[in-house]
Design a protein with these regions (language model features):
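RNase H-like (RuvC/DEDD) metal-dependent nuclease/polynucleotide-processing core
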Residues: 2-9, 13-296
Length: 297
């Protein structure tokens, strides 16, 4: 049976990327890194993100990334068909029954499940220009870190690689967070931070007290950068995914083999339990859900 991650890394992957590192002890968890890479379209910016994920994987940490791990299967089939107009390998793009922007081509199966659970519409990886590029960036990143040989079949599920897809907006909705317009309104962002630390009973979550006023630097970053806050949520869900029993793992649901194959191809969003509480993340009270026979959790 796997043990919970001692360290988790949260990556809010976007042009301006938030990074959060949490170190987990037996009774508390400490935020030791919280920063924002201003522009990952530059070589320097991308290297910072890549090095963080490479270090995490090398050390056996769990990583939660807010970015789609794949495209809808029907969309991929359409692209393959366009590259082969003879239809010998995948059929003509015009033979598909779906309309050009039908659900099957626009939304991944995991996004539909996420919407049912949280009521939140995920940004489409195929019709949202800003997201499409990050799907490719994320796949390049996971390929460089994991490689094709090691657990590639389950690579988009994350259950065996320790690199999981997360969606902070859905998690916050499940937790009934007062999100307001925190992406654009700093007052709402500060209110969201206060809600997390005061209303959700996370007294076990603290800031590093390292030298140079690190605690206050971390807190200021969290209160002023929505990317940093999202990265923190990513790191929290990464810890949840690492818990014994793999509570976020799709193997713990009653999906068919065909559905699991679809998740392996398109990706799987790891969601918290459908309850407005974070008690299951308390290091002093780790829940045991039962060992997963598939992923070994």
């Amino acid at each position: 049976m796997k043990r919970p991650a001692d360290v988790t890394l949260g990556i809010d992957l976007a042009n301006r990327t938030g990074i959060c590192k949490i170190e987990w002890g037996s009774t508390s968890a400490t935020i030791t890194r919280l920063d924002v890479v201003q522009d990952i379209t530059t070589e320097k910016g991308w290297d910072i993100v890549k090095q963080a994920v490479v270090e995490a994987h090398k050390n056996g940490w769990w990583v939660g990334i807010d970015a789609p791990f794949g495209f809808p299967e029907a969309f991929g089939q359409s692209v393959e068909a366009l590259r082969d107009p003879t239809g010998k390998t995948s059929g003509s793009p015009h033979t598909f029954s779906q309309a050009p922007f039908s659900d099957a081509r626009v939304w991944r199966a995991t996004e539909k499940i996420t919407k049912d659970a949280s009521g939140i519409d995920h940004l489409s990886s195929t019709v949202t220009n800003q997201i499409t590029g990050h799907v490719i960036n994320c796949d390049d990143l996971r390929y460089e870190v994991i490689g094709r040989a090691r657990n590639w079949a389950d690579g988009r599920l994350g259950c065996t690689t320790g690199i999981v897809e997360v969606y902070p907006a859905a998690a916050l909705k499940i937790w009934e967070a007062p999100v307001g317009k925190y992406k654009t309104n700093q007052v709402d962002l500060c209110g969201l931070v206060k809600w997390l630390f005061r209303s959700m009973s996370v007294s076990w979550l603290q800031f590093s007290t390292g030298g140079g006023g690190l605690k206050w630097k971390l807190l200021r970053t969290l209160m002023s950068k929505d990317d940093a806050f999202d990265a923190l949520i990513c790191a929290l869900i990464a810890r949840l995914a690492s818990l014994p029993g793999g509570p976020t793992c799709p193997y713990h649901h009653t999906f068919t083999p065909a559905q699991m194959d679809l998740f392996r191809s398109e990706g799987w969003i790891h969601l918290p339990p459908l309850a407005p509480t974070l008690c299951y993340l308390d290091p002093a009270n780790i829940p045991y859900i039962g060992q997963c026979p598939q992923c070994g959790g």
